[in-house]
Amino acid sequence: MEALMARGALTGPLRALCLLGCLLSHAAAAPSPIIKFPGDVAPKTDKELAVQYLNTFYGCPKESCNLFVLKDTLKKMQKFFGLPQTGDLDQNTIETMRKPRCGNPDVANYNFFPRKPKWDKNQITYRIIGYTPDLDPETVDDAFARAFQVWSDVTPLRFSRIHDGEADIMINFGRWEHGDGYPFDGKDGLLAHAFAPGTGVGGDSHFDDDELWTLGEGQVVRVKYGNADGEYCKFPFLFNGKEYNSCTDTGRSDGFLWCSTTYNFEKDGKYGFCPHEALFTMGGNAEGQPCKFPFRFQGTSYDSCTTEGRTDGYRWCGTTEDYDRDKKYGFCPETAMSTVGGNSEGAPCVFPFTFLGNKYESCTSAGRSDGKMWCATTANYDDDRKWGFCPDQGYSLFLVAAHEFGHAMGLEHSQDPGALMAPIYTYTKNFRLSQDDIKGIQELYGASPDIDLGTGPTPTLGPVTPEICKQDIVFDGIAQIRGEIFFFKDRFIWRTVTPRDKPMGPLLVATFWPELPEKIDAVYEAPQEEKAVFFAGNEYWIYSASTLERGYPKPLTSLGLPPDVQRVDAAFNWSKNKKTYIFAGDKFWRYNEVKKKMDPGFPKLIADAWNAIPDNLDAVVDLQGGGHSYFFKGAYYLKLENQSLKSVKFGSIKSDWLGC
């Protein structure tokens, strides 16, 4: 059977949307016991994870990676990521090892493969051999083209696509062992890998198709038919008073999945049908014809898509009732409620479904200890035990491809956490190539001649990762969150447990709180609920650990601030009275965390209530159990005694907080 190809044209009659109303109800359920799901991969122990990680990325041989060698190699890994070099498997080290990343080994700041391989020409060809079912081919083509442009914008390299024959860079998707001796590992973990420039497999780039490939912000679903043909689903969307985060068949009697292409379907009425095998197939040789169920394959009748007869795990179906006779087939779309992992081969969720006697009409984490959202792929999990993980934000194909193509140009991994070539995946909404990346690639190929001739885009310096002891940094926010002190500057953070110790970092904010904008104005922790509250512009975000609370961000007005307050300077929860203080300009407000509203009698002037505290603050923090509050502005801070409100110290942030 031929390899996965681009989707064919969609055929089949247009079916009108027939709204029947919401009939589903969710049964409230007590907390479920933790169970073992069939087909679930057991998580590795910390030691198993460390040995595999250090073997793969730092060359520690599995058979001789004993405690002594392990400790030394761990220190190398910790140094690479800016972690305390303890040589121990502490929590921060394990957290870093469990993050999704590239499959190539690590080195240091922009670096090159051994012997610095590079292309000996500037005209580079690429060919897309296969596609992921997660995105339509046009979106995949565009993501790869934009990823190559990241590098052509700053070098003389020019990339052109060919559709036949051998290209310099062959691009494909695969699962587990996929023919190059470097297997992938299922969902999450290793995302992709690429080979250094050269002949044969040189430059080839492979992407793990057990991942959910998106543009970084959830499923990208292009609808067919309806009254919004070719537009994209809007998730979540509102229908009959309920929000939907994926395609649904609610309101239909034919089982076809649909979505709204605007948030409010009831207001706008814009919709289309989501990819589904009953509407169309892609690739294959059936020119987009829908599946025909049941169909016969090798003498067996199939009532749904299958992976039988294939070694790559892709779901397919016959488009006539007898594949053995007609040899007509197509691949089943996997962008509409398709599951990832589990034991259902990508089959879609079925709602409602029964689990341990309770009904669920949406994805749930019930029964799991890792908090991952899942669903059943039949109406009754208890009977059938068929399930899969629900789609999440997925991984940006553009960002991962831009990183891998950096390897295909000759760059290794960078130790700079702000660089595209850093090994750990972090979604960045408004991506810009960093100075570290530009310096590395231009050392190999030089600068783009278009810039010198004035025919290219106006050059702009890429962002530089700040160094807290070498620069005078004014922090955007400082807060104690879950017992650690965090310093925020643009898209970076530094963290420490104790003041005066040099903070660990820089790290990317998006690694911990991915939905935040690239720059915040203020942050504090509400200790009563252990939730972190972030402010940026006229909005605020609330997180439980790294999970954004539903419905956020919200406008500052919903917190009780007046409409003319378009940003805040600082905020902190005061241990003296458990109230939260919000500062903007020369005023401050007091918020009651218990009653969830502003206290009356505010705002007040900072100068009238706080001894020696200036206006336009940068940050405020009250360290737990310390009895003092700290007010930051510019390069200095004021330390106030909480009971007397007396200023007891004026000091330097660098020397007293950053260990410089």
Curated annotation (Swiss-Prot):
Q: What is the effect of changing residue 644 to I?
A: In a colorectal cancer sample; somatic mutation
Residue ranges for the region (Collagenase-like 1) are 110-221
Which sites are catalytic? Answer: 404
Under the heading Gene3D superfamilies, the entry gives: Collagenase (Catalytic Domain), Fibronectin, type II, collagen-binding, Hemopexin-like domain
- Describe what upregulates or represses it: Aspirin appears to inhibit expression.
Q: Where is this region: Required for inhibitor TIMP2 binding?
A: 414-660
Q: Which UniProt keywords apply?
A: Angiogenesis, Autocatalytic cleavage, Calcium, Collagen degradation, Cytoplasm, Disease variant, Disulfide bond, Extracellular matrix, Glycoprotein, Hydrolase, Membrane, Metal-binding, Metalloprotease, Mitochondrion, Nucleus, Phosphoprotein, Protease, Repeat, Secreted, Signal, Zinc, Zymogen
An annotated GO cellular component of this protein is: collagen-containing extracellular matrix
Q: Matching InterPro entries, A to Z?
A: FN_type2_dom, FN_type2_sf, Hemopexin-like_dom, Hemopexin-like_dom_sf, Hemopexin-like_repeat, Hemopexin_CS, Kringle-like, M10A_MMP
**Residues at which Ca(2+) 2 binds:** 168, 200, 202, 204
Q: Which GO terms describe its biological process?
A: angiogenesis; blood vessel maturation; bone trabecula formation; cell migration; cellular response to amino acid stimulus; cellular response to estradiol stimulus; cellular response to fluid shear stress; cellular response to interleukin-1
Catalysed conversion reaction: Cleavage of gelatin type I and collagen types IV, V, VII, X. Cleaves the collagen-like sequence Pro-Gln-Gly-|-Ile-Ala-Gly-Gln
Reproduce the UniProt comment on modification after translation.
Phosphorylation on multiple sites modulates enzymatic activity. Phosphorylated by PKC in vitro. The propeptide is processed by MMP14 (MT-MMP1) and MMP16 (MT-MMP3). Autocatalytic cleavage in the C-terminal produces the anti-angiogenic peptide, PEX. This processing appears to be facilitated by binding integrinv/beta3.
| Annotated glycosylation sites | 573, 642
Q: Name one GO molecular function term.
A: metalloendopeptidase activity
Activity control mechanisms: Inhibited by histatin-3 1/24 (histatin-5).
The cofactor named in the record is: Ca(2+); Zn(2+)
Which EC class, in a word? hydrolase
Record: disease: Multicentric osteolysis, nodulosis, and arthropathy: An autosomal recessive syndrome characterized by severe multicentric osteolysis with predominant involvement of the hands and feet. Additional features include coarse face, corneal opacities, patches of thickened, hyperpigmented skin, hypertrichosis and gum hypertrophy.
What family is this protein classified in?
A: Belongs to the peptidase M10A family.
Domain comment as written in the entry: The conserved cysteine present in the cysteine-switch motif binds the catalytic zinc ion, thus inhibiting the enzyme. The dissociation of the cysteine from the zinc ion upon the activation-peptide release activates the enzyme.
Show the PANTHER family listed in the entry.
Answer: 72 KDA TYPE IV COLLAGENASE, MATRIX METALLOPROTEINASE
What does the record give as the function of this protein? Ubiquitinous metalloproteinase that is involved in diverse functions such as remodeling of the vasculature, angiogenesis, tissue repair, tumor invasion, inflammation, and atherosclerotic plaque rupture. As well as degrading extracellular matrix proteins, can also act on several nonmatrix proteins such as big endothelial 1 and beta-type CGRP promoting vasoconstriction. Also cleaves KISS at a Gly-|-Leu bond. Appears to have a role in myocardial cell death pathways. Contributes to myocardial oxidative stress by regulating the activity of GSK3beta. Cleaves GSK3beta in vitro.
The protein here is known as: 72 kDa type IV collagenase
Name the species this protein comes from.
Answer: Homo sapiens (Human)
Q: Write the lineage as a comma-separated list.
A: Eukaryota, Metazoa, Chordata, Craniata, Vertebrata
